[in-house]
Amino acid sequence: MLIVLSPAKSLDYKTPFKVKAPTLPEFVSESAKLITDLKKLAPQDVAKLMGLSDQLAALNVGRYRDWSKKFTEENSKPAIYAFDGDVYDGFDVKTLKPKAVEFAQDHIRILSGLYGVLKPLDLMQPYRLEMGTSFKNARGKDLYAFWGNRVTDSLKKALDKQKNPVLLNLASEEYFKVLQPKELDCPVISPVFQDAKDGKYKIISFYAKRARGLMARYVVENRITDPVDLKGFSLDDYKYYAAESKIDKPVFRRVERK
């Protein structure tokens, strides 16, 4: 089983980490092409393109300027430790045992606008470039055109090494769109997380994002390779709801929080 996650906008480059053997991203040369184009943008261009404040735009112009093809532990951090949003709050890598992190390296891929796809321990320099950004480049009008089949091909290679080739989609729609699922030639499972509110079950973005991270954690902690075992997921009081589930869209529900 291979999990795909979305990245996070929030980054943490301050908290220390211990990783014996960090790895390098697969598509550094492709990232460098994007950086070359991003370096041409003025802060006001970045602000307009990405809908950022002047302060955040200036921060990211600096990041593009400082980005280097050489990844070191001084300018980079393993992706799974660097991302700091709701998904990664749920995953909580800092409390995982080394063996679980090792399993994650083989069974998780993080989709990225700048890096294409990252393994958890791939060194990553800080950036902001969401996959849905309409950033014109030599290959087309946006990042989906830029990455083409590259990310899909990378995942296909990783899936071919899996004992049970199944893609567990814990990414957002924006990021999953970079893939061509049919070309993966394997089942794709996209769990749905619903919370009760005002007497109805619905997807609440903040909770759903965190639940994706929790499920990724559940998989790596329990070394799950068979999708049937996902039904046992019960972290943070979520429970499998068979009546609403489909094979490719298992539904997990949680009663209203008080």
Curated annotation (Swiss-Prot):
Highest taxon listed in the record's lineage: Bacteria
An annotated GO cellular component: cytosol
InterPro entries noted in UniProt: YaaA
Pfam families per record: H2O2_YaaD
Gene Ontology terms: biological process: response to hydroperoxide
PANTHER family xref list: PEROXIDE STRESS RESISTANCE PROTEIN YAAA, PEROXIDE STRESS RESPONSE PROTEIN YAAA
Family, as annotated: Belongs to the UPF0246 family.
Record's protein name: UPF0246 protein Pnec_1068
